[in-house]
Amino acid sequence: MKTHILVATDGSDTANKAIDLAAELAAKFDVPLTVGHVLQFGRPSRELARMAEVEHIVESVQKTQQVDFNILSGAGGGDLFATSRPSSDMVRVITLMGDEIVNRAADRARAAGAKQVDTLTADDDPADGILDMAEKAGADMIVMGHRGLGRVRSLLAGSVAQKVNNHAECTVVTVR
């Protein structure tokens, strides 16, 4: 029997399916669920800006924070590929986006019946971040989407799900 589940999310539709399944399993077996998100520092800023717009992250974050999301589109003078180290403004925006993604996912999991839900974020390669969060949470199951937001990158470097599946020391459930 499983005793702790980690569900990884990047805010994509496939990740939402994984959250729903993980929440259902956590509720059924009455085990804790950790919702994990790897901050998206390696993602092109225009792609992040589009995601923030489509998912209404900008509006949600700006209700409580004073943030200039124009930095994602380049209007704020920055791009993730412009330097090897993102500016402090870019770090703040990506961190706030990550917090919003993980908090929405936790709310979704609770609404689906999970009773014990906590959250983690990581700043790492996506696969390594997920594996580290699973270890930190003491998870004996990882639930994640088959393919998230990084379709092009996964074609070049292999999918995050594939890497997690190959290196995890626990059960990995991949949702399509």
Regions found by a protein language model. Give the residues of each.
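Small/aliphatic-rich secondary-structure junction motif
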Residues: 3-83, 112, 116-118
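Short beta->alpha connector loops
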Residues: 12, 123-126, 149
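Short, conserved glycine- and acidic-residue-centered signature motifs
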Residues: 15, 94, 98, 157, ...
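Conserved beta-strand termini and adjacent loop/short-helix elements that scaffold enzyme active sites
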Residues: 36-38, 120-124, 175
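Structural beta-alpha unit
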Residues: 74-142
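Gly/Ser-rich helix-loop-strand patches that form or flank binding pockets
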Residues: 128-176
